[in-house]
Every structure is written in structure tokens, then in C-alpha cells.
């Protein structure tokens, strides 16, 4: 098993949102949003990165019955300079204007996400292969140059 790098102490907080909830929000904005308006989409699921990593480890350990999948895989690495400690999202506007809110609790969404990845190993193999990396680098290498 590969080590899992975690920046600094892993206490950077992010707002987590299940993919289907995000897609529904995009759909609602496309169908009913006002042109030129900005709608923040958030899940009201703020968690520290280290919590996410440990949750994934626990879920994979339980599903795969592999004692090699444990917190021992976590490797704390030097934090990025200026790394934000928290990304807070206020989705009040999209809720008030369009009636959108996240339907999937974090605990259910993370399990559904892990299950999807486990059921689609061929997709994972493809995107982690050298060929995909070469394609990605070729497609985006000059995009920042304007």
C-alpha cells in the first residue's frame, strides 16, 4: 500500500458535498438561476482533512478486510505555504432563491462515493495510468499561458 500524504496537521477544514447533490444544484441554477448571478453551492458538511482521510481508511479496511489499510499509511508532509485553514461556503442564496439544499448527509455520501470507486476499478486504473497523465499534461500544459 502507498502512503497517504496529508498536509501539515491535517486540520484544514473543507466543506464536503455529495456529487449528486452538486449536480442537482448545477441543474437548478441552469434551469432557474438568474443570468449574471453567483450561487455558492455548499454541503454544510465541514470536516478537517485528517477526518476525511481516516474515514476513508476505516471504510476501506472494513470493506476489503485488509489489515494493511490503517492509519499507519498516513504520512504528514510539509504544509503548503499560505495553505488556507478553512474554505467556508455559504449556500444561503441558492437555498433562498432556488430552493436547493443538499439532500445527502456526509456519512451516507462518503460511503456511496467509496462504493462507487470500488465498483469502478477499471476507471481508477485508467485515470492513474501513465497514459492518462500524459494526456492530461498535454491537454492542459499551455492553458495557464494567456
Q: How does the language model describe each region?
A:
Residues 1-146:
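C-terminal substrate-binding subdomain of Rossmann-fold SDR/epimerase-dehydratase oxidoreductases
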Amino acid at each position: 500500500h502507498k502512503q497517504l500524504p496529508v498536509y501539515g496537521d491535517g486540520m484544514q477544514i473543507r466543506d464536503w458535498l455529495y456529487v449528486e447533490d452538486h449536480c442537482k444544484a448545477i441543474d437548478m441554477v441552469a434551469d432557474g438561476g438568474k443570468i449574471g448571478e453567483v450561487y455558492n453551492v455548499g454541503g454544510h458538511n465541514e470536516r478537517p482533512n485528517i477526518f476525511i482521510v481516516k474515514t476513508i481508511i476505516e471504510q476501506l479496511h472494513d470493506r476489503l478486510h485488509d489489515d494493511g489499510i490503517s492509519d499507519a499509511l498516513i504520512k504528514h508532509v510539509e504544509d503548503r505555504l499560505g495553505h488556507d485553514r478553512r474554505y467556508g461556503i455559504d449556500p444561503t442564496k441558492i437555498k433562498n432563491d432556488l430552493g436547493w439544499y443538499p439532500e445527502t448527509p456526509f456519512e451516507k455520501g462518503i460511503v456511496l462515493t467509496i462504493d462507487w470507486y470500488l465498483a469502478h476499478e477499471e476507471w481508477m486504473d485508467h485515470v492513474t495510468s501513465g497514459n492518462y497523465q500524459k494526456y492530461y499534461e498535454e491537454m492542459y500544459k499551455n492553458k495557464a499561458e494567456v
